A protein has these predicted regions:
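Short, aromatic- and cysteine-enriched interfacial helices/patches
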Residues: 3-7, 25-27, 85-90
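A charged, solvent-exposed segment within the mature domains of Sec-exported extracytoplasmic proteins
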Residues: 131-196
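Bacterial N-terminal signal peptides that target proteins for export
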Residues: 3-17
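Sec/Tat signal peptide C-region and signal peptidase I cleavage site
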Residues: 29-33
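Acidic, serine/threonine-rich low-complexity disordered tracts
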Residues: 34-130, 174-295
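Bacterial N-terminal signal peptides
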Residues: 15-26
Length: 295
């Protein structure tokens, strides 16, 4: 199974599920994520979330999201790392960054990602104007096998990149724990492949993690291929038929956004789970409950 198994079945870097959008490119990070205090922009909020990655009950890596929010602007840095025997064999590592503006969904203006295994690597850079792709470069270029579904120009408008896809702006001005904040479609484009991730509300749970104690929204997830995929590949059909995927969303203090607390994805090798081990914030409201009550 791959780090990209969540939304990009064609890649085979061992370690399914790296945080929704980043999973799309089979990402890992060159250095193990360590808890650190995020630096909030003046008048804004920042958060760092550290994760453990498990496959079929075995720990295989770590991941980290770092987000900064100031007014309508955001920046997202995402990384992950394969550890133990899997990491020693594959050498998987990488990092991604996105920046843009927040509206009903993230409107990215720039995205970049670089990944590497022991025997290969890939880099993607995209320039966008409020979520509309103006340029995308992949190094090395993908090999055209002649069986990929084309990505239309229309499909490259109003998209979110893999890193921005992790960021869920709250709907309206209501409670951040409103179940309606689950219900959304993420139109993801990773530079080569266009797909939708459809989220729907399942339930609300209470969690207690270092740095965060409070409600999380449990959202079911479905994958829908749009373009750039190879429809005859078994992995594509597996993911489109996969009904055993979910994400837990937690509110970010001082910002009207939610980030993943936990992601679970069934794969052909077992269930992959990415779960937060630490939630570190700066700026914004002093407590999660105060932030929720303020809105």
């Amino acid at each position: 199974v791959t780090m990209s198994a969540l939304f990009h079945p064609r890649k085979a870097l061992v370690s399914a599920a790296t945080l929704f959008g980043i999973a799309a490119l089979g990402l890992g990070s060159g250095a193990e994520a360590r808890p650190r205090a995020p630096k909030a922009p003046p008048g804004g909020a920042a958060v760092v979330v550290d994760y453990g990655v498990n496959l079929a009950g075995f720990p295989i890596g770590t991941a980290q999201i770092s987000g900064a929010f100031e007014g309508s602007r955001y920046r997202m840095d995402v990384s992950a790392q394969l550890t133990g025997l899997v990491g020693a064999v594959t050498g998987g590592q990488g990092s991604a960054r996105a920046a843009g503006n927040l509206s009903e969904k993230p409107l990215p203006n720039a995205f970049s990602i670089a990944t590497r295994t022991s025997n290969s690597g890939i880099a993607v850079r995209m320039a966008l104007a409020n979520g509309n792709v103006s340029r995308a470069e992949i190094t090395p270029p993908l090999i055209d096998m002649g069986d990929r579904v084309p990505v239309s120009a229309a499909a490259k408008r109003g998209i979110v990149d893999p890193a921005s896809a992790l960021l869920m702006p709250a709907h309206g001005r209501g409670d951040l724990a409103d179940p309606a904040n689950c219900n959304r479609t993420l139109p993801v484009f990773d530079g080569a492949t266009r797909f939708n991730v459809v989220l729907s509300y399942s339930e609300t749970r209470q969690v207690d993690k270092p740095g965060y104690s409070g409600p999380v929204l449990v959202c079911n997830a479905r994958y829908i291929a749009i373009g750039g995929h190879r429809p005859d590949r078994p992995g594509v059909k597996f993911m489109e038929d996969n009904t055993d995927m979910s994400v837990w969303l937690a509110p970010v203090e001082g910002a009207r956004v939610l980030l993943p607390m936990r992601i679970s994805v069934r794969t052909t090798l077992g269930t992959n789970i990415i779960e937060a081990t630490r939630w570190t914030r700066s700026g914004g409201a002093p407590t999660a409950q105060a932030s929720l009550a303020a809105h």
